[in-house]
A protein has these predicted regions:
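N-terminal ligand-binding/catalytic initiation module
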Residues: 1-122
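Glycine-rich phosphate/diphosphate-binding loop of Rossmann-like nucleotide-binding domains
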Residues: 126-208
């Protein structure tokens, strides 16, 4: 939609088990090729994640190209919702990077094929705490396999990406007395985390 500045890509990777499902993320990609590659990669991952979880749904993912701070709003989200609706239920979306519950509510105005709505509207609410807890449990399982104990105390753990999921994960790790390092490309997110927690900041280029 050139008028609204909406440029989105929906990747449906697999529908053998059911309709494709995966969140929508908004990102200021360097190129359309980068956006397509990301959508393809993420949709493939959703196929495996949904299958492993024993869900009767396939894998899909959507990306919206652009700076969320500049172009995102009700009109854009509703237009995107109409596009999803045009797929007739082949793809269901939900919240991902730079998207909110409110964005899902806007999309819901145009299509029923959306999850992650607010609790007051019968949804599950913010998925970030649950996502973070899943990562936390996976960390403990890995540590137990390697060290024989699932304690994270005194373990050095780096969290790259300090959005909602990263913030909740850091909170869990700090409670377990882990030594937490953090990295993000956005200074405001680093500032918000360092004001809340005692962590060590690492430059993104130094992570690997």
């Amino acid at each position: 939609d050139h008028v609204l500045g909406l440029k989105a890509i929906i990747s449906i990777h697999n529908t053998v088990l059911g309709p494709a499902m995966g969140g929508t993320r908004m990102w200021d990609y360097a190129s359309e090729t980068a956006a397509i590659e990301d959508a393809l990669r993420l949709s493939r991952g959703m196929t495996y994640k949904n299958s492993i979880a024993g869900l009767n749904i396939g894998g899909g993912k959507a990306v919206i190209m652009g700076d969320a701070k500049k172009i995102k709003g009700e009109k854009l989200m509703r237009r995107f919702g109409k596009f999803i609706n045009g797929l007739g239920g082949q793809y269901w979306t939900a919240e991902d990077v730079n998207m909110t519950i409110q964005d899902m509510e806007y999309i819901r105005m145009e299509t029923p094929f959306v999850a992650g709505l607010s609790e007051k509207n019968g949804g599950s609410g913010d998925p970030s705490p649950v996502t973070a807890y899943g990562v936390y449990c996976a960390m403990k399982a890995c540590v137990k396999t390697v060290y024989g104990s699932d304690t994270l105390a005194e373990k050095k753990i780096l969290v790259q990406g300090l959005g909602n999921v990263g913030s909740y994960l850091i909170e869990l790790l700090i409670k377990d007395k882990a030594h937490v390092l953090v990295a993000d490309i956005f200074d405001d997110k680093i500032k918000a985390i360092t004001e809340r927690f005692k962590v060590t900041v690492v430059a993104v280029d130094d992570v690997y």
